[in-house]
Amino acid sequence: MGNHGKLSRVSADRIRNFCIIAHIDHGKSTLADRLLDLTDAVPERERVDQILDTMELERERGITIKAQAVRLLYNRPDGVWTLNLIDTPGHVDFTYEVSRAIAACEGALLVVDASQGIQAQTLANLYLAMEHDLEIIPVLNKIDLPVADVPAATEELVELLGVEPEEVLKISAKTGEGVRGVLDAIVERIPPPRSEHPQTRALVFDSNYDPYRGVIALARVFDGGLKKGDRVQAMGSEEEFEILEVGCYSPKPTALPALQTGQVGYVVAGLKDIGALRVGDTITSADDPAPEPLPGYARVLPTVFCGLYPTEGDDFERLRDALARLQLNDASLFFEPENSRLGFGFRCGFLGLLHMEIVQERLEREFDLDLIVTSPSVKYQVVVDGEVREVTNPSDLPESYDEIREPVVRATIICPREHVGAVMGLCHEKRGVSVGMEYISSLRVQLTYDLPLAEVITDFFDQLKSRTRGYASYDYEPVGYQPADLVKVEVLVAGDPVDSLSIIVHRDKAYQRGRALVEKLKELIPRQQFEVPVQAAVGKRVIARETVRAYRKDVTAKCYGGDITRKRKLLEKQKAGKRRMKQVGRVEIPQEAFLAAIRI
């Protein structure tokens, strides 16, 4: 505890706040483990791999989902330095988590795999860091691999950042080679935090909910300080509260007397209302508030929408509570109640398909819920009588409209030059428009395309990986809306439209998607005593049809010989009964059919 006593009184000149920018699998979590080892942050008996990836899901998928903040004490001959590491995700869907971490730092380690070179998502996060004027320290990792091409990767970084070749640190996080040099570079190259205002201001860059202590916020103090007992105010929600405790993670929670300018730590607010202290908010003193909040980061807008329904109708309230809790930790999650053929559920908005999968898995694991998820869709703009409406659910699309516009993204794809033809072919199939192409190095090309978001969120990433044998990487950002020839494909089972299976697609692909849907449903809908037509329709026109054959019930089995008219009478009666069933019978669609159709 001796070191922690000094922590709260440490001079701002001896603090360094930094984050790690890296692509998935480039060794960021392993490097974080080595930095923790070298600063003795974790006792040897408690060391595990990827110690900052606390969520079971993060370790299982080998990705970082939530940003984490850890304080390291680094002993050098010139004294003890406090290094605050803010660990960030690398996947495109979690760019928002990265932007939050960047807002809380003065410097960044740019970690690149020496065998793969820089990737598209790393590039996107690097530009984000440069916009915030962060000091960038380039680090080449995995130099111990036999396939590592250190000179080529170094040249790429030198060209990209305009640095000298000797400024690029060459390390192996796995073996620990060169890692101490990273700690020295953090101290020597990254500037200390600076205070600009006399009033207290702290930026909330993450938060979570504790059932006993209420909302716990992770914050970076930019001006002034925070201590236990202070009356403070969240500038966004204007909610006032008293601080119950402040402290830091090293990496276990450690209470401190105060958090001073430049320090990163947690604040226990004791608030029970999840929405009172949102991510991106500024905490200031209630008695002497700051005139304006810190420039947080833009409110992110969801790009992918889907319906989430509990399989048991009674679980509706549990699902609402679970979503509200996840939303506290994940400000980019959006949800609102909706009702359909599947019962009561929620229309949810996500940053991308991986984000959607992660939220679904967390709901099922952490809250023990059984869920049905409808097809993902995007937000369309529909012009009706000159008025623009937003539609996220295909069943809300009006019968007639003047124009429909779809969201477009600008995708940056980096791939080896021998795969350029395959990538261009894929982008054209997905209705992409080429914007530019440039060589990053003699072997790797950066292609830029404008693509409809609806085409990107389905199987674009899988196709890109398979066509380039896993060598391509991509990143995208929204660029607005464009008019498109889109239609709504409705599914009718026994003449009844099934809202949950409606999709909005480009007219050229309507037949193909409609055909695939009805064929899948034909396999999965159980046979009835009457024929069940399964149709896909655009407006009033049926574009594809399959029939679930009726099974025959042998009504004459009880007749032993005797008059043929007796059998005929029974068969006529059955025929009339079937005709009546066909008119009034509702076909129950099993959940497997919904799930299979959704995945098409």
Swiss-Prot record:
Topology of this chain in the membrane: Peripheral membrane protein
Coiled-coil stretches: none
Record keywords, A-Z: Cell membrane, GTP-binding, Hydrolase, Membrane, Nucleotide-binding, Protein biosynthesis
Single Gene Ontology BP annotation: positive regulation of translation
Signal peptide: none
CDD domains for the chain: EF4_II, EF4_III, LepA, lepA_C
Catalytic reaction list: GTP + H2O = GDP + phosphate + H(+)
EC number: 3.6.5.n1
Chief location category: membrane
Entry binding sites for GTP: 25-30, 141-144
Function: Required for accurate and efficient protein synthesis under certain stress conditions. May act as a fidelity factor of the translation reaction, by catalyzing a one-codon backward translocation of tRNAs on improperly translocated ribosomes. Back-translocation proceeds from a post-translocation (POST) complex to a pre-translocation (PRE) complex, thus giving elongation factor G a second chance to translocate the tRNAs correctly. Binds to ribosomes in a GTP-dependent manner.
Record HAMAP family: LepA (MF_00071)
NCBIfam families cross-referenced by the UniProt entry: lepA, small_GTP
Name used for this protein in its record: Elongation factor 4
Originating organism: Rubrobacter xylanophilus (strain DSM 9941 / JCM 11954 / NBRC 16129 / PRD-1)
Gene label: lepA
